[in-house]
Amino acid sequence: MVKKAPRRTAERILEVTLELFNRFGEPNVSTTLISAELGISPGNLYYHYPAKDELINSLFDRYERALNELLNASDGVRDVEDAWFFMHTLFELIWQYRFFYRDLNDLLSKNRRLETHFQSVLKNKTRAVKAMLDGMSRTGAVHIDTREVEATATSMVVVLTYWLSFEYVRDPRRALEPENAQAALLRGAQHVLNLLVPYLEQSQRAHLLKLVGAYNNGAK
């Protein structure tokens, strides 16, 4: 029997850890549970990840790389259709790593590395939203005073960051279950883009309402 390469074992550990963290919340998942779920000894888990924080940090590194790559696409947003797709894709990535957002304050209070890196995440999100607003302004899709851009971008990032927390508080037992993903992501994208409604050109505003209606009907 061919033994699995250590690299593959390490990746499998991260995959299962992410599933457990997302399902139960990071504070409720021990390394003992992780090793039991994997069917490996605690010592084998320790060989690859000597501490729970190393699991968390490795998962965050994956999330941060994927996020930064996605945020670079903000330069290509020109209208409401682009913005809707961009925001929905962002929420899909956030959903994949939703335990970070469910347990964010607890994680930040215990993990200094995560604390500093999440500050960079917020800055990069804000920078990307500003780039999106700039692109939409140049095409006439939005008409926004430059003095309002900073506050509007910040408000959009706040909703992006805490939307899943809101969903969880509203319905703790079901909100973050996989079968509820589509509806939660649609609501998140809708509420972020609703912050642009006062600034949208009339036809763009109508198109946003059309998109929201179409996706809501499809999610039912």
Descriptions of predicted regions:
Residues 2-10:
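Short, Lys/Arg-enriched anionic-surface-contact patches
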Residues 72-99, 153:
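Hydrophobic alpha-helical connector segments
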Residues 9-16, 152:
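N-terminal positioning helix adjacent to the helix-turn-helix/winged-helix DNA-binding module
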Residues 61-67:
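Short, basic, alpha-helical segments at the C-terminal edge of helix-turn-helix-like DNA-binding modules
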Residues 12, 20-58:
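Helix-turn-helix
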Residues 94-116, 130-134:
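Amphipathic alpha-helical segments used for helix-helix packing
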Residues 165-220:
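C-terminal peripheral helix-coil segments that are non-catalytic and often amphipathic
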Residues 113-139, 150-165, 183-198:
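Amphipathic alpha-helical packing segments from all-alpha helical-bundle domains
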